[in-house]
Amino acid sequence: LAGTVPLANK
């Protein structure tokens, strides 16, 4: 998913 919003995964 690190292509749209990288910080949203944390």
Curated annotation (Swiss-Prot):
This is Unknown protein 2.
